[in-house]
A protein has these predicted regions:
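Bacterial Sec-exported substrate-binding components of ABC uptake systems
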Residues: 1-77, 178-182
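A short, structured surface patch at a secondary-structure boundary
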Residues: 68-124, 128-134
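Extracellular/periplasmic catalytic domains that process cell-envelope and extracellular macromolecules
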Residues: 45, 62-64, 122-123, 144-146
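Solvent-exposed, polar/charged alpha-helical surfaces in well-ordered, non-transmembrane soluble domains
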Residues: 51, 67, 79-83, 119-123, ...
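Short, structurally constrained coil/turn elements
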Residues: 47, 85-87, 145-147
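Soluble periplasmic/extracytoplasmic beta-strand elements of cell-envelope proteins
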Residues: 52, 62, 70, 92, ...
Length: 182
């Protein structure tokens, strides 16, 4: 699952880095919008639940319901991956980094950049929160878990080489391990 589009076309529109005398004064393109929408791997998916796992914080978690998901990370990659897995309609809120057109009408549950607003999260009645420590604070994640919301903390370290593995882990969390391989 991933973005379809032409990276080469996008880079031709950007100025060369050395053409700006003071990078802090640079204005203009700040959001690349020419990428095409993410296409799901299937029109309809059937998550295989429950999923039992140990999250990155060492908590044993059982995921029973993926009908109302909040996927929170600094890059917005969790929402993009869930969209690619066919679960876009299950996403009920977003961070400021989740800029996909299909999510723009969803409420933002972070403030001041990437600080989780616990009240905003709980007001959406999520059945599953997927988060990593690229946003926080940690106390906010603990409060969401203490409120009884199934919360899975993922490993925040990502590299270009780990993309496939990261998507596979996320697919495993939501009961779609086979779809995550596509």
């Amino acid at each position: 699952c991933g973005v379809q589009g032409g990276y080469e076309d996008l880079t031709s529109e950007l100025p060369a880095a050395d053409s700006v005398s003071d990078p802090r004064s640079f204005t203009g393109l700040s959001n690349v919008s020419d990428f095409k929408d993410i296409e799901p791997v299937a029109d309809s998916v059937e998550p295989q639940l429950p999923v039992e796992l140990t999250d990155a914080d060492g908590n044993d978690v059982t995921v029973n319901d993926v009908s109302r998901i909040l996927a929170l990370d600094i890059y917005g990659t969790y929402t993009k991956s869930l969209t690619g897995l066919g679960l876009a309609d299950n996403i009920v809120g977003r961070t400021v980094s989740s800029t996909e057109p299909n999510l723009q009408d969803l409420p933002v549950v972070t403030e001041g950049g990437h600080n989780i607003n616990v009240e905003a999260v709980l007001s959406l009645e999520p059945t599953l929160v997927i988060v990593d420590h690229s946003i926080g604070p940690r106390d906010a994640i603990d409060q969401i878990r203490a409120a009884g919301v199934t919360t899975v903390v993922m490993e925040p370290q990502r590299t270009i080489d780990s993309v496939g593995e990261d998507i596979a882990k996320l697919g495993g969390v939501v009961g779609l391990p086979e779809e995550a391989k596509e």
